[in-house]
Amino acid sequence: MASKFLREYKLVVVGGGGEGKSCLTIQLIQSHFVDEYDPTIEESYRKQCVIDDEVALLDVLDTAGQEEYSAMREQYMRTGEGFLLVYSITSRQSFEEIMTFQQQILRVKDKDYFPIIVVGNKCDLDKERVVSKQEGESLARQFGCKFIETSAKSRINVENAFYDLVREIRRYNKEMSNPSGFGARAPDSKMDVSEPGESAGCCGKCIVM
């Protein structure tokens, strides 16, 4: 039975331009794929769901990837509780930009670790792949965080990416509140790349707010 306490989670989707951040977010919230989408400045979406028998209100901020909006980044990085660092497996540049975003998040938060998941998007375009799965896994290990490949178009692992970030936030907060611990640490192991398709039973009914 799901808990009735409604906890809000401020999730931020970060990455360069054109790697599918907005498509991932809209697929999660509205369950459809957008072929054409205007470059995002900043869009916020809300969705209520149940993750591991706990009710959660996801407040998802889809951010600008373009360089001209870089001055806005520190503002949303200060308020975010967890971050999806998204790159396209078809773009080497978007992959290389992930390091900059991760370092900026840790600098703004003044932390050695913070809830982050590395997301390799557009995994349905495997024939156009220029970033291997192993490279994504290696970068996530370097960050001490989890890794997953997704496809907004084919709806592969879309919910898993967001829900696993919520789980990581919960784990982080639990460690931070543990008086006998020394603060939150990175996960002990990376996330294995899930097979195509959403995992069954990880979430109950979801409601767009």
Curated annotation (Swiss-Prot):
Lipidation (S-geranylgeranyl cysteine): 206
Motif (Effector region): 37-45
Reported induction: Expression is dependent upon interaction with host roots.
Keywords per UniProt: Cell membrane, GTP-binding, Hydrolase, Lipoprotein, Membrane, Methylation, Nucleotide-binding, Palmitate, Prenylation
GO molecular function: G protein activity; GTP binding
Catalysed reactions listed for this entry: GTP + H2O = GDP + phosphate + H(+)
Residue numbers bearing the Cysteine methyl ester modification: 206
Annotated control of activity: Alternates between an inactive form bound to GDP and an active form bound to GTP. Activated by a guanine nucleotide-exchange factor (GEF) and inactivated by a GTPase-activating protein (GAP).
Membrane topology term: Lipid-anchor
Lipid-linked residues (S-palmitoyl cysteine): 202-203
Residue ranges of the propeptide: 207-209
Binding-site residues for GTP, renumbered to this chain: 15-22, 62-66, 121-124
NCBIfam families, alphabetized: small_GTP
Family named by the database record: Belongs to the small GTPase superfamily. Ras family.
Protein name per its UniProtKB record: Ras-like protein
Origin species: Laccaria bicolor (Bicoloured deceiver)
